[in-house]
Swiss-Prot record:
Residues 101-153, 712-731 are annotated as: Disordered. The keyword Phosphoprotein applies. The modification Phosphoserine is found at S127, S131, S159. Disruption phenotype: Loss of nectar secretion accompanied by starch accumulation in nectaries. CDD domains: HAD_SPS. The gene is SPS2. Expressed in roots, cauline leaves, flower buds, flowers and anthers. Highly expressed in maturing nectaries. Activity is regulated by phosphorylation and moderated by concentration of metabolites and light. One of its GO terms (biological process) is nectar secretion. Belongs to the glycosyltransferase 1 family. This is Probable sucrose-phosphate synthase 2. Disulfide bonds: none annotated.
């Protein structure tokens, strides 16, 4: 290429391909929101592709010269106004691209400044010297290659000598492990990899991981939870509720129980009879969580009867894969109180950074990928996970470091303190563990070739797939360059074909085979996939590659090993030229078959190459480098043989048993916090209320002696506001904490506590009132209306769910003429407290509520306590400093409303409060994990444990007391506290009372994504009542199929 001539040739190609470009608008101007790049879903524009080639491939100076040259043409016959205008526009786009790069640099600098500030604040609070023991410990790092020579045979890690040793040490354990992968089409056999962008390497990974874990000694059962798909356009196997995975071949006989092994469990959720992409699954995650929770509870009970001595066998861990499953796993981990493990596979922030650098507007990115919802889910995974498993160090150092919730420097400091037994002051960071994905090599036999490349076993019949590929070639004996990937722009197959077509020596020495999924008709594929295939076909024609390139339309998953063997037989090379490859499982597969590799320098292949040392790394953007690397390997037989041998020698380090041993060792290091209560059957219980089962435990009762006269003299809304009232509230708080402390010291899971079920267990309908009103009087009116509409009876129960404390709730109920006994349970302090109502007590002045102490132990995971409170106080000072208001304090600590698991603050001016996402970001930067909620019309900020919420409290009732969530009806308003969205989705039914709204709708946002990315507003489980009236509520309940008591 020489300067302007090549630029002009590109521009002429653009004009010939799509004349209408001259009338288009650059991205980000006017009404145009189009991108210059290929979209994974959507219309492919050759024009945009060529423009991007120009912008990324040439200096701005060259582009400017092209415009000057076009504008300087004097002859009317030679002058082309369209070319002149086009040159100017593309030059302008190049300048905009530089501006985007500048913005990206500023954003990265701002992120580093914020992170450095957080580090300084944490270091100041931690006076310990961090210098000792802070060097990074990289657990699970891949061992260095050994010098053993296996003479062309791989070392099989699953052989008897190694596996027996592991089996002897772990055979007594009986673990239950849950894996979750929601999107794509998942089945154990004949996986349709490459069918769409959701059914790729992750599907293969999770299925093989489940199968390998199920074959490990000490693991009794593995459940891989995914979505049940009953759509007519997919195979019926994806609608089967369960599928048992065949175990991997081992020479060890293991004891098999009735429910042991590995299973794919398909949970129905989301649109029925429709297969939807992962971007549209977000609103349906709460439904999946509820149904998955019921399944896990059922299996835990079954396993308890088989191997647990009658007590439930809880999962030792729940492992989420990708952001959508990670979001689900965090909620399930909190509901069950078991350790969470997470694997990102592909991370949203990294994708966002790449797309922003390419000049795509944020609105378009979020519209296509739901990127903000995805990123928040990944941040929640960092909050809730004990272990984050990655495939490479690159993922940790360059991708996870982009998140608010992970700082490699701070993580090492906290780990150093933990090793020395020093308190981390309420700060937590998940452990990043590098464990490469595995393969099972027991059945793989590399193709044996002699020094001349001839087959040592000519009598063996060739597999059918060989002839299917060889029919494309005019000279099938030439070495085969093999690429196996979806026809996706990210896989960079177009550049590969260009490199092959433009390198005559390479074309003379080798053939090219492209395995790009399965297809019948190109026009039936997605626009992106079809565009890539059409581009490749045009390049084949352009370079006259007929007889040199194979593009078979169909292959089975079982054919893939044979395809690798064919490439090795011809002394070929496997190539993965993707722009970015998170890991590169196909590179391991190729190495296992004795096939040297050429791979991208971006991502996981770097780590794989460091271990296998069986090929070359190239810049995927450098077409000439790709051609040179391929030519070098196919032309140098000594290099080819050395790379083949290195791969075979070291491939055992990527075996599934090796992966699982490291995996299980890391899981064993997690602190097990399973529920400690004794589960019993309630069906034959005769109790009528929670108080019947709790009445004899006097230590649990909250003997708070209240002055009823004093309470009645308070404000109209039932909440004390004067100084005397605050003093009384502080005294009451101290008495509550003393009662809870006494409970923790004296109460144990006695038979009387657990021998009878709460009344809620036997309710046919349970109505949960979670309406957040601007005034307490409005809330009381709603409560009375709902109770009146639903009716009272033994089959009907009520739960009040609120942000108020128990004493505030009690005072409000009395002021409205309601009795505590009208409710079976009360959820207080935004979900951090759970009480059952009690009808009898020897002390007539005691509050008639019984604290569920097990709930506190259930939600205390990663609770920062006093360190969190100090950080919040500092944050309040910084907010007030930024606002510099003359009105005085914006936010003050409310000790009277705070409890051991809820830090409460009074908001003096809600309009001056920063967005909730700013507070979350601050906490995550400081490694403090919490759930912050703006409530009570914006007048209060409640900060509670990270996995506590009003919606999670309902799931706790299922886990602790076996209460069916589908029997619940949750009443909410048009809007509410900032935890409002969590109350809408799930298998429970929801009634939205129109006309009831909190003024929080005017507050800074709780999220950066729309409500439709959170909850399915068109769900049949959600309906609206036109007004908060008795008749309107009855009509809404009838729509939901709720039968009410007749008056």
């Amino acid at each position: 290429m020489v300067g302007n001539d090549w630029v002009n040739s590109y521009l002429e190609a653009i004009l010939a391909a799509e004349p209408g470009i001259a009338n288009s608008k650059p991205p980000g101007t006017g009404d145009s929101k189009s991108s210059l790049l290929l979209r994974e879903r959507g219309h492919f524009s050759p024009t945009r592709y060529f423009v991007e080639e120009v912008i990324t491939g040439f200096d701005e100076t060259d582009l400017h010269r092209s415009w000057v040259q076009a504008a300087a043409t004097r002859s009317p016959q030679e002058r082309n106004t369209r070319l002149e205008n086009l040159c100017w526009r593309i030059w302008n786009l190049a300048r905009q691209k530089k501006q985007v790069e500048g913005k990206n640099a500023k954003r990265e600098a701002k992120r580093e400044r914020e992170r450095e500030k957080a580090r300084r604040e944490v270091t100041a609070e931690m006076s310990e010297d961090f210098s000792e023991g802070e060097k990074a410990d990289l657990p699970g790092e891949i061992p260095t290659p050994s010098d053993n020579n296996t003479k062309g045979r791989m070392s099989r890690i699953s052989s008897v000598d190694v596996f027996e040793n592991w089996f002897a040490q772990h055979k007594e354990k009986k673990l239950y492990i849950v894996l979750i992968s929601l999107h794509g089409l998942i089945r154990g056999e004949n996986m349709e990899l490459g069918r769409d962008s959701d059914t790729g390497g992750q599907v293969k990974y999770v299925v093989e991981l489940a199968r390998a874990l199920g074959s490990m000694p000490g693991v009794y059962r593995v459940d891989l939870l995914t979505r049940q798909v009953t759509a007519p356009d997919v195979d019926s196997s994806y609608s089967e509720p369960s599928e048992m995975l065949n175990p991997i071949d081992t020479d060890i006989e293991q004891e098999n129980g009735e429910s042991s092994g590995a299973y794919i469990i398909r949970i129905p959720f989301g649109p029925k009879d429709k297969y939807v992409p992962k971007e549209l699954l977000w609103p349906h995650i709460p439904e999946f969580v509820d149904r998955a929770l019921s399944h896990i509870m059922q299996i835990s009970k079954v396993l308890g009867e088989q191997i647990g001595g009658g007590q439930q066998v809880w999962p030792v861990s729940i492992h989420g894969h990708y952001a959508d499953a990670g979001d689900s796993t965090a909620l399930l981990s909190g509901a069950l109180n078991v350790p969470m493990v997470f694997t990102g596979h592909s991370l949203g922030r990294d994708k966002l950074e790449q797309l922003l650098k390419q000049g795509r507007p944020k609105e378009e990115i979020n519209s296509n990928y739901k990127i903000w919802r995805r990123i928040e889910a990944e941040e929640l995974c960092l909050d809730a996970s004990e272990i984050v498993i990655t495939s490479t160090r690159q993922e940790v150092d360059e991708q996870w470091r982009l998140y608010d919730g992970f700082d490699p420097v701070l993580e090492r400091k906290l780990r150093a303190r933990m090793k020395r037994g020093v308190s981390c002051l309420g700060r937590f960071m998940p452990r990043m563990v590098v464990i490469p994905p595995g393969m099972e090599f027991h059945h793989i036999v590399p193709h044996d070739v002699d020094a001349d490349g001839d087959d040592e076993n000519p009598q063996t019949a060739d597999p059918p797939i060989w002839s299917e590929i060889m029919r494309f070639f005019s000279n099938p004996r030439k070495p085969m360059i093999l690429a196996l990937a979806r026809p996706d722009p990210k896989k960079n197959l177009v550049t590969l074909v260009k490199a092959f077509g433009e390198c005559r020596p390479l074309r003379e020495l080798a053939n090219l085979t492209l395995i790009m999924g399965n297809r019948n008709d190109i026009d039936e594929l997605s626009s992106t996939n079809s565009s890539v295939l059409l581009s490749i076909l045009k390049l084949i024609d352009k370079y006259d590659l007929y007889g040199q390139v194979a593009m078979p339309k169909h292959h089975q998953q079982s054919d893939v090993p044979e395809i690798y063997r064919l490439a090795a037989k011809t002394k070929g090379v496997f190539i993965n030229p993707a722009f970015i490859e998170p890991f590169g499982l196909t590179l391991i597969e190729a190495g296992a078959h004795g096939l040297p590799t050429v791979a991208t320098i971006n991502g996981g292949p770097v780590d794989i190459h460091r271990v296998l040392d069986n090929g070359l790394l190239v810049d995927p953007h450098d077409q000439q480098a790709i051609a040179d690397a391929l030519l070098k390997l196919v032309s140098d037989r000594q290099l080819w043989g050395r790379c083949r041998q290195n791969g075979l020698n070291n491939i055992h380090l990527f075996s599934w048993p090796e992966h699982c041993k490291t995996y299980l060792a890391r899981i064993a290091s997690c602190k097990q916090r399973h529920p400690k209560w004794q589960r019993v059957e309630f069906e034959n219980s005769d109790s009528d209320s929670p108080s019947d089962s709790l009445r004899d435990i006097n230590d649990i009762s909250l003997n708070l002696k209240l002055s009823l006269d004093g309470e009645k003299s308070g404000s109209n809304n039932g909440v004390d506001t004067n100084l005397d009232a605050e003093d009384r509230a502080a005294e009451r708080k101290a008495e509550v904490e003393k009662a809870v402390s006494t409970l923790a010291q004296k109460s144990k899971p006695t038979e009387k506590f657990d021998s009878k079920m709460p009344t809620l267990k036997r309710r046919k309908n349970i109505f949960v009132i979670s309406v957040d009103c601007s005034a307490t009087s409005d809330l009381l009116a709603v409560v009375k209306t709902v109770i009146d509409a639903a009716g009272r009876g033994s089959s009907t129960g009520f739960i009040l769910s609120t942000s108020m404390t128990i004493s505030e709730t009690h005072t409000a109920l009395l002021s409205g003429g309601l009795k505590p006994q009208d409710f079976d349970a009360v959820i207080c302090s935004s979900g951090s407290e759970l009480y059952f109502t009690s009808s009898g007590s020897e002390d007539k002045t005691a509050l008639p509520y019984t604290l569920d102490a097990d709930y506190h132990s259930h939600i205390e995971f990663r609770w920062g306590g006093e360190s969190l409170r100090k950080t919040l106080i500092r944050w309040i000072s910084s907010v007030e400093e930024k606002k510099k208001t003359k009105k005085g304090e914006i936010l003050v600590e409310d000790e009277s409303s705070s409890t051991n698991y809820c830090l409460s603050f009074k908001v003096k001016d809600p309009a001056l409060m920063p967005p909730m996402k700013e507070l979350r970001k601050l906490m995550r930067n400081q490694a403090l994990r919490c759930n912050a909620v703006y409530c009570q019309n914006g007048a209060r900020l409640n900060v509670i444990p990270v996995l506590a919420s009003r919606s999670q409290a309902l799931r706790y009732l299922l886990v602790r007391w076996g209460i069916d969530l589908s029997n619940m009806v949750v009443f909410v308003g048009d809007s509410g506290d900032t935890d409002y969205e969590g109350l809408l989705g799930g298998i429970h039914k929801t009634v939205i009372l129109k006309g009831l709204a909190s003024d929080l709708r005017e507050q800074p946002g709780n999220r950066s994504y729309p409500m439709e990315d959170v909850t399915p507003l068109n769900s049949p489980n959600i309906t609206e009542a036109k007004e908060c009236g008795r008749d309107a509520i009855k009509v809404a309940l009838e729509k939901l199929g709720i039968s009410l008591l007749k008056p």
